[in-house]
Amino acid sequence: MRYNEKELQALSRQPAEMAAELGMRGPKKGSVLKRRLVKLVVNFLFYFRTDEAEPVGALLLERCRVVREEPGTFSISFIEDPERKYHFECSSEEQCQEWMEALRRASYEFMRRSLIFYRNEIRKVTGKDPLEQFGISEEARFQLSGLQA
C-alpha cells in the first residue's frame, strides 16, 4: 500500500491515543532491541528515535496479530507475512497489557465490527436503526457475513 510521506508525517504529529518509550526490534534477522518512542495514532503505530521529531517508520494496524511473547513483551505480525514480526519490550507487564489492548482496538476492522454490534443491539432495544437518521442504511460495507440482526 502506498502512502504520502507528508501526510504520514502530519498524522504522526497528531495527539496519540498512547505513547511511550519501548524497546523495539524489527523483523530482520539479527535486529537488535533499540529504545524507540512509540506512538499510536488512529490505526498507525509510529516509531521514532528518542531524540528526533520525525518518525523512523510506521505500521498500519490492519490485518495484523498482536501476540504476547515473554513476560513484558509482545509482537506484531501481519496476516500476509506472519514470519515478519516486530517485537516490543515494555517496562512492566501492566504496560504490556495496556499496549496490546490498545493495538487490538486500533484497527478499522475492530471499529467496524463494534459499529455493527452496537447498531444491532440498539435496534433490538428500540426497534429503530440508530444510523438511519444520518442517511446510513443497510449498506454492504457495514455488513459481516453470517451476522444476524
UniProtKB/Swiss-Prot annotation:
Pfam families: PH (PF00169)
Cellular component terms per the entry's GO annotation: cytosol; early endosome; recycling endosome; trans-Golgi network
PROSITE patterns listed in its UniProt record: PH_DOMAIN (PS50003)
Tissue expression as described in the entry: Expressed in testis and liver.
CDD domains: PH_PLEKHJ1
Gene giving rise to this polypeptide: PLEKHJ1
GO terms under biological process: endosome organization; receptor recycling; retrograde transport, endosome to Golgi
Protein name: Pleckstrin homology domain-containing family J member 1
Domain of life: Eukaryota
Occurrences of domain PH (ranges): 15-108
